[in-house]
Amino acid sequence: MPLVVVCGLPSSGKSQRTEELRRALASEGRAVYVVDDASVLGAQDPTVYGDSAGEKALRAALRAAVERRLSRQDVVILDSVNYIKGFRYELYCLARAARTPLCLLYCVRPNWPSRELREASASENRDLAVSVSWRPRAETGGKSQAAGAVEEQRATSPVANGGVLAAVSKELDPEEILPSNPSAVMTPGSEKSAEPASCAFPPEVLESLALRFESPDSRNRWDRPLFTVVGLEEPLPLAEIRSALFENRAPPPHQSTQSQPLASGSFLHQLDQATSQVLTAVMEAQKSAVPGDFLKLPGTTEPLRFTRPLTLAELSRLRRQFISYTKMHPNNENLPQLANMFLQYLNQSLH
């Protein structure tokens, strides 16, 4: 089934849009798999985007995870920055090789990452970055907690950077408040962890990603169909995405994405034998030839025009080239004509 590539800068709403799309497709009974940075790293690590070697390894891990999941039965959603068009082209080739459609979901946050928005987002995340542990009232005998403990339920924002923070249950009392890790919050029913707070990305990493970001272009075949959503208020174009994923025909495979036919052992043996015999015959025939003659070799109908003395090294190099090309397009029907085909190749290559 199709591949959905989600791209955009950190804190642009990618994880929230991914979860929204996952829920919509899962409600139709479809199997949906989400691949993100945390699922391949084991834990969210924003600093990996500041290290070229680590980022390269991350892209390789994401590509491998997508390739393992990609099939004609399941929907795969890749939730990552995906800011390099070359990497998006690799994903396009994966989908094309699997003969399954692909679409791109581009999440945009206006004026991000500006300094003012970063400071405001960091302030909001500091207010939300608390972890509450509870103890049932029965264990405390219904008594109030120690001094300084919070007695009233504190409702948190339902959405923070695409992750869902569960409300505190009325049956439990807070016991202590400790710093938390926002990336550890899991979305119910999802296989992926929530996107980390934007303050987890150092400002220099955000600015570097913004400068390096290669925006999708619908004129590129690997970037279309392209769906752009601005902010979190704009509704997700679910109808158009469904049409692109399930109604469009998958792109046909071409030579770079389809498996080459396997050549039989006898074909390769006869190819090697025929070209070797031609080389031996040419080296012997040119001993009595003068420039301008046409060499007639035994067992062939194609003459070889003799223009200058040929060395064994030059003929061996052309023979290797011919064998490499012929192995890519094996055809048992050409077995009787291998020697003539090699002579035609020599006539075109020799000057």
From Swiss-Prot:
Statement: the UniProt record of this protein carries the keyword Ion transport: no
GO MF annotation terms: ATP binding
Sequence positions bearing Phosphothreonine: 156
Binding site for ATP: 8-15
Post-translational modification Phosphoserine, affected residues: 157, 198
N6-acetyllysine PTM sites in chain numbering: 143
InterPro entries: KTI12/PSTK, P-loop_NTPase
Keywords tagged on the record: Acetylation, ATP-binding, Nucleotide-binding, Phosphoprotein
Region (Disordered) location: 177-197
Entry keyword Chloroplast: no
Family (UniProt): Belongs to the KTI12 family.
Name the record gives this protein: Protein KTI12 homolog
Organism: Mus musculus (Mouse)
